[in-house]
């Protein structure tokens, strides 16, 4: 009987022979990224044929999945009489019974310093000579003799060459350095469960290691929790979909996605007169709220009669955009500090017009009954919290590896920063303060109204959206299928740039979400 690995290889080979379009097929079936990493390794070994014609590569380490072995690599070193410890990398093992190798990718050791030289690793478990198993060796993790087994960082250039420790030669990375890769050929051997110690050397000829490393494997059985979590996400998505759709469109199949949020931002940029939007990227961050409250320059002048129902408002907190150019709010209904606002007007009771809100201490409301000096209350409009990059700026970002460079804010343009000025002037010119808040989104006939309808129609809508994003962010590193619930639409997804989901604006300013197009642009930026 064939082993699980053999059957998996046969299954993958059949799929490829049927001429599937792999990018679309992979995203439609939600192939886990550690499986794709495993496929990539099979290709390298020559087990699969004609695979690289699909031009699919994955640079990130395998993701943690339920019911898999989860291995970690820790570095311990001393510097100036201080002992430091750092988790360098993690990797997911295949299911028990399938002895496929795993790899720690892009290892960057803090103890090596900027020189990096030509490092080597020494492990205690694979020493065959008795002189390399003395108490001194075990205490110092030392391999001072040439007959000890030492794994030097090599460049894997041929299929026949399969070193354990080798240089990461993938493109990109700062200064052209992408770290090192460490391959474990037998991840389910019992020794990895108890933990394996080793030494890291700046060069194989050095007597003492610069750091000690430890590799350990644990078995994760989180399938029940992830199943429940996926079910909750799907239920929340169905609830949100029904809230997003107008009554006339309830029968149509539609759902909220990152593309909807990005489209809102692109159309809003165009309708407010922002120029030169072609060949740009709009990005939404998982860890950032989808909407931002932008303060408006003048008070609301809007009245409703007693029979007009007051629409509900989104629950939860919405962050307030702070303009770095103007350090004061243009108008406040109340403030605990007069220096915060250019103008303040005390009110006893007033309603907000359609698509307008009162922002009071991080909470949104449609009716302002009373204010006090201890509360900051502002008239606001909700804007998608997106980041705008040019192609050159995106190229700069793609050239860096994790963590994201600290000076990102010097070139990234936050959408509310652009719209906070242009939107304010356009709203005043279009009738703000004369009985109606004419939001620029309202004038665009071809713009999807889903997001605004959700905000106006149900108090639960924003809460539901935020809950989904928060939930997905928690499992994004564990389950790519859950991430695709919001990011993918029928085999298409965004360009996932570190922690952001990015879409390309073509020559006409239209959002383009073809995965293949974006991956080509990503490749061209890295070359």
UniProtKB/Swiss-Prot annotation:
Disulfide bonds join 494-501. Its main location: virion. A motif (CKS-17) lies at residues 477-493. Pfam families: TLV_coat. Residues 412-527 are annotated as: Transmembrane protein. The record marks 411-412 as: Ancestral cleavage site. Residues 1-411 are annotated as: Surface protein. The keyword Disulfide bond applies. Residues 412-432 are annotated as: Fusion peptide. A motif (CXXC) lies at residues 280-283. InterPro entries: TLV/ENV_coat_polyprotein. It is found in: Virion. The CXXC motif is highly conserved across a broad range of retroviral envelope proteins. It is thought to participate in the formation of a labile disulfide bond possibly with the CX6CC motif present in the transmembrane domain. Keywords: Disulfide bond, ERV, Transposable element, Viral envelope protein, Virion. The keyword Disulfide bond applies. Orthologs in P.troglodytes (truncated), G.gorilla (truncated). Retroviral envelope proteins mediate receptor recognition and membrane fusion during early infection. Endogenous envelope proteins may have kept, lost or modified their original function during evolution. This endogenous envelope protein has lost its original fusogenic properties. Belongs to the gamma type-C retroviral envelope protein family. HERV class-I F(c)2 env subfamily. The CKS-17 immunosuppressive domain is present in many retroviral envelope proteins. As a synthetic peptide, it inhibits immune function in vitro and in vivo. This is Endogenous retrovirus group FC1 member 1 Env polyprotein.
């Amino acid at each position: 009987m064939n082993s699980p690995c053999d059957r998996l290889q046969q299954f993958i080979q059949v799929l490829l022979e049927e001429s599937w379009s792999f990018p679309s097929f992979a995203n439609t079936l939600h192939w886990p990224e550690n499986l794709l990493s495993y496929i990539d390794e099979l290709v390298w070994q020559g087990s699969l044929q004609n695979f690289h014609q699909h031009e699919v590569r994955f640079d990130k380490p395998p993701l943690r999945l339920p019911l898999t072995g989860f291995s970690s690599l820790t570095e311990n070193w001393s510097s100036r009489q201080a002992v430091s410890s750092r988790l360098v990398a993690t990797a997911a093992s295949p299911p028990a019974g399938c002895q496929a190798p795993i790899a720690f990718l892009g290892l960057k050791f803090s103890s090596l310093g900027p020189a990096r030289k030509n490092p080597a690793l020494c492990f205690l478990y694979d020493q065959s000579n008795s002189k390399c198993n003395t108490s001194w060796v075990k205490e110092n993790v030392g391999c001072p003799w040439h007959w000890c087994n030492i794994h030097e960082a090599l460049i894997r250039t041929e299929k026949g060459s399969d070193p354990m420790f080798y240089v990461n030669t993938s493109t990109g990375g700062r200064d052209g350095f992408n770290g090192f890769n460490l391959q474990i050929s037998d991840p389910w051997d019992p020794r990895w469960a108890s933990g394996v110690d080793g030494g890291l050397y700046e060069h194989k000829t050095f007597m003492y290691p610069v750091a000690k490393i430890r590799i350990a494997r644990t078995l994760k059985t989180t399938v029940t929790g992830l199943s429940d979590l996926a079910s909750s996400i799907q239920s929340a998505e169905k609830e949100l979909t029904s809230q997003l759709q107008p009554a006339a469109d309830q029968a149509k199949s539609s759902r909220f996605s990152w593309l909807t949020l990005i489209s809102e931002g692109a159309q809003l940029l165009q309708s407010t007169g922002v120029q030169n939007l072609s060949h740009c990227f709009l990005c939404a961050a998982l860890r950032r709220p989808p909407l931002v409250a932008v303060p408006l320059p003048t008070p609301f002048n809007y009245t409703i009669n007693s029979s007009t129902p007051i629409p509900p408002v989104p629950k939860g907190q919405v962050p307030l955009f702070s303009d770095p150019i103007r350090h004061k709010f243009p108008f406040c209904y109340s403030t605990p500090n007069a220096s915060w606002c250019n103008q303040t007007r005390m009110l006893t009771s007033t309603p907000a017009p359609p698509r307008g809100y009162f922002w009071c201490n991080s909470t949104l409301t449609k009716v302002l009954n009373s204010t006090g000096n201890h509360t900051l209350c502002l008239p606001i409009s909700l804007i998608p919290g997106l980041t705008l990059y040019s192609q050159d700026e995106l190229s700069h970002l793609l050239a860096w590896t994790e963590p994201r460079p600290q000076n990102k804010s010097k070139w990234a343009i936050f959408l509310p920063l652009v719209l906070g000025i242009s939107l304010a002037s356009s709203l005043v010119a279009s009738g703000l303060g004369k009985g109606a808040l004419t939001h620029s989104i309202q004038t665009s006939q071809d713009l999807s109204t889903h997001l605004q309808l959700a905000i106006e129609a149900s108090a639960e809508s924003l809460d539901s959206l935020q809950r989904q994003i928060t939930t997905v962010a928690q499992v994004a590193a564990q389950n790519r299928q859950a991430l695709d619930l919001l990011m993918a639409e029928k085999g298409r997804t965004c360009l996932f740039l570190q922690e952001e989901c990015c879409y390309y604006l073509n020559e006409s300013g239209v959002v383009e979400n073809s995965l293949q197009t974006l991956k080509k642009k990503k490749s061209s930026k890295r070359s």
